Each structure stands twice: as C-alpha cells, then as structure tokens.
Amino acid sequence: FKYAWVMDNIKDERERGITIDLAFQKFDTPKFNYTLIDAPGHRDFIKNMITGASEADCAVLVLSAKPGETDTAIAPGGQAREHAFLLKTLGVGQIIVAVNKMDDSNFSEDAYKAAVEKGKGLIKSCGYKADEVPFIPVSGWMGDNLVKKSENMAWYSGKTLLEAFDDFVAPEKPTGKPLRLPIQDVYS
C-alpha cells in the first residue's frame, strides 16, 4: 500500500484500504505539470469521484488482473463501468487504463491480455477509441511499471504509467465560453 498511502491520508482510508475523500498531489514530468486527483473507487463514495472527475482533463481507469475482479468491475452495476461512463459523460476525453494487481496473477501476460480484452470492450461502449487508449500492466503494491520498468514483466515493452502521462494532449481551454464550475454541496 505504500503508493496508495501517498494519497490516502485519512486514518479510515488507511485502515480500510480504500480511498474515501479526494486527495490532491502536484508533480511534474518533462512535458507537463500535473495535479493528481485521487478519487474514490468504492460505490459508497461515488459523489466524491464525480467531484474529482469533473475537474479532470484526463484520467487513469484502474482494472484488475486478479481473476474475476475485472469481470465484476465491468459488469452492469460494476464500478469500473460506472466510472468509465461518468468520465466520458463529464467530458474527460483522454484516459489510460492501468491493469493493476499484476503481482496477484504472478505477472502473467495472459491475465493482462484478458483484462485488456475486457477493458477495450468497456471503453469502446463508453465512446472512447479503444485503439487510442494505452493499457499498462502495473502492480500498485510492488510499484511495478508505475515509475520505472518492471523486471517482473519482461514480456511488456510499452511505457510505464508515468511515461504514458506525457502522451496526453493538453486540451483546449474554453476561455471564450461562459464560466462553469462544479458544486458539491450547498450550506445554508
């Protein structure tokens, strides 16, 4: 969880192993300055995910290489399905799909390919061009392919997650249009 703990600062998040609230972290790459918005994936906190996604120019959708988890996530009512549709609906036009938990499948290329095949069907149904979306095998637990190439996945020759961020294209800002901003709560 060391990489998740960078963003999960609330005691409940660390104890339960899930993101509850939005967390923001700034970082730079050679091409862009980023503000990472870590949004919850759990269905109980979908309002927080929508708030974060409404501010995003691009996103990382996370699927699992662990057998059965991607099937559940992309099925009707599944969280990955809901998040993918919400991202597209909220105008997030560019995504990367991180195939996580590669360590749970012993870094199996077959597990990765199975998740990619299912993931491509999902994102295509949401309106994304599946052939333009990179799928990157990662292990959040071990740190594989997040920042540096994984020695455990010699079969993968693509970019790391961090390297893939610089393939995003900066969206044109609607500076000549009326102001729009997300509102999460109203207090009286």
Predicted regions and their residues:
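P-loop NTPase switch module centered on the Walker A-proximal segment
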Residues: 1-47, 56-69
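Amphipathic alpha-helical transducer elements in NTP-driven molecular machines
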Residues: 4, 20-21, 39, 43-46, ...
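Residue-level signature of catalytic and energy-coupling elements of molecular machines
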Residues: 17, 38, 49, 60, ...
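Structured core elements
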Residues: 19, 26, 35-36, 60-62, ...
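Short, glycine/acidic-enriched loop or turn micro-motifs at the edges of active sites
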Residues: 41, 103, 142
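Conserved C-terminal guanine-recognition region of P-loop GTPase G domains, centered on the G4
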Residues: 52-53, 59-132
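Conserved catalytic-core segments of large NTP-driven translation/proteostasis enzymes
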Residues: 113, 120-188
